[in-house]
Amino acid sequence: MNKFITLTVACFALFVQADAASNKATVEKLYDLYENGTAREFADTYASLVAEDFDRWLGRYVGLGFRMNDDEMTVAEVVNSPAKDHLKPGDKILSVNGIKAKEGNELPFQGPLGGEVKVKLERDGKKMTVKMNRALQTNRGDKERMLGWLSTFNEEDWKDRSKVIQRNPVVADGNEVYASFESKDTNEDGNEVRWWTVERFIFNDGGQIVHHGDINEDLLIAQQNGYKLSK
């Protein structure tokens, strides 16, 4: 009996190790394609790994909880509160806190937590004003949004992607895979900007990605571009 239990445990351990090794190899392949492959090779490979219940964690921010079509200055999608209670897809933004909505103007949707945002908009031919207070938001994406983003990849833009300077060894534990790497890019002034990114992938038993999240040095990136937090 004890021999049977020992054998069962050993087989399970081998299965977990094999599964972890496969997931690790998948992430390493994605990184190799990002560094050395074409836009389509990377996008198609990633798209083939996206599970039905895929969740992309894109960080948190302070804002209103909607996505905007910057070209048309219209509301593209309402995601969270407080925007859910005040905005509708298709609303045309006219001004925000007195700042006219036009190309070149930075609209203060984001800012201090709890700060009031007064939005003048046009809906179905009628002009109106709505007031909201900024709240903590989580930026997420599902399978549809991820596949839509991957479909926009093209070889011309791919040439200008940020470059990976160095990668730490990928670490896998069962269905979870962790990786970190340093990237560099060139800003508008021609200066080199560097930052580190840490990523976490979770795979299902079929080898597809159900979760992909990352954090990076946003503050350091901003500082290298000449921005700083107010004291």
Residue ranges and their predicted role:
Residues L107-E144:
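PDZ-domain C-terminal substructure recognizer with occasional recognition of PDZ-binding tails
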Residues A21-S22, L147-K231:
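A beta-strand edge to alpha-helix "cap/lid" segment located at domain peripheries
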